[in-house]
Swiss-Prot record:
InterPro entries linked: FSCA_dom_sf, MIP18, MIP18-like
Record-level GO cellular component terms: cytosolic [4Fe-4S] assembly targeting complex; nucleus; spindle
Lineage top rank: taxon: Eukaryota
Protein localization: Nucleus; Cytoplasm, Cytoskeleton, Spindle
UniProt main location, coarse: nucleus
Entry protein name: Cytosolic iron-sulfur assembly component 2B
Source species: Dictyostelium discoideum
Chain's role: Component of the cytosolic iron-sulfur (Fe/S) protein assembly machinery. Required for the maturation of extramitochondrial Fe/S proteins. May play a role in chromosome segregation through establishment of sister chromatid cohesion.
Keywords, ordered alphabetically: Chromosome partition, Cytoplasm, Cytoskeleton, Nucleus
GO BP terms: chromosome segregation; protein maturation
Family: Belongs to the MIP18 family.
């Protein structure tokens, strides 16, 4: 049974830019850099990477469910650090870890290795936020979850695949 069988949809498909709409901008010269250049990212670019991730329970994107929002993306380019807050649809969401793993994995696959990425549950939005945050930001736990559990990796891959 779903934790949230009837989630609120904040953005409908017609008003939501798809990844394909943004694909041309990702292939522009702004993103074509030489190996020795530092590529600067902004909050919009990071948001564009995660907005189209689908929810593990519903055929909706994290943007449509208001799980990710551009104002919850924080970047410190000087330290190559990204902090992204996400808000589960209900305080008892059992999919929070999978959503967080999907966000982390999408960013890990998309960003240069120099970036440290922390994905955190928005404070006060989940009943087990400290436990979820601890698991999501422990490299060994994340690696173990993705490397040793083919079912978790399959779900994460399904969530982050481009539609």
């Amino acid at each position: 049974m779903s934790d949230n069988p009837n989630p609120v949809i904040y953005v409908d498909n017609e008003n939501c830019k798809s990844f394909e709409d943004n694909e041309n901008s990702f292939n522009s010269s702004r993103y074509s850099i030489e190996e020795d250049q530092i590529d600067e990212f902004d909050e919009q670019e990071i948001f564009d990477l995660v907005r189209s991730i689908t929810d593990p329970e519903h055929p909706l994107t994290l943007e449509q469910l208001n799980v990710v929002r551009i104002e919850n993306v924080n970047i410190n380019l000087e330290n190559s650090y990204i902090l992204l807050y996400f808000t589960p649809t209900v305080p008892h969401c059992s999919m929070a870890n999978l959503i967080g793993l999907s966000i982390k994995e999408k960013l890990a696959r998309s960003l240069p290795k120099r970036f440290k990425v922390d994905v955190i549950v928005t404070p006060g939005s989940h009943s087990s936020e400290s436990s979820v945050n601890k698991q999501l930001n422990d490299k060994e736990r994340v690696s173990a979850a993705l490397d040793t559990s083919s079912s978790i990796l399959t779900i994460v891959n399904e969530c982050i695949k481009q539609n």
